[in-house]
Amino acid sequence: MPKMKTKSSAKKRFKVLGNGGVKRAHAFKRHILTKKTTKNKRQLRGTSMVNDRDLASVAKMLPYA
């Protein structure tokens, strides 16, 4: 059986943690930031965890993680 390929888009966006969780960045923080409030931009800093319902699809995209 051939090797499975990792989705390049997923390996750039997700980081698998030791406890089995997956870390991701927040959306809505790339451009058109002038109309967003300072509070909103501050809350979008840092990282978040992928929801439990989405873990299966992320795991399919990252077969060796």
From Swiss-Prot:
One of its GO terms (molecular function) is structural constituent of ribosome. InterPro entries: Ribosomal_bL35, Ribosomal_bL35-like, Ribosomal_bL35_CS, Ribosomal_bL35_sf. One of its GO terms (biological process) is translation. The keyword Ribosomal protein applies. GO terms for cellular component: cytosolic large ribosomal subunit. PANTHER family: 54S RIBOSOMAL PROTEIN BL35M, LARGE RIBOSOMAL SUBUNIT PROTEIN BL35M. This is Large ribosomal subunit protein bL35. It comes from Neisseria meningitidis serogroup B (strain ATCC BAA-335 / MC58).
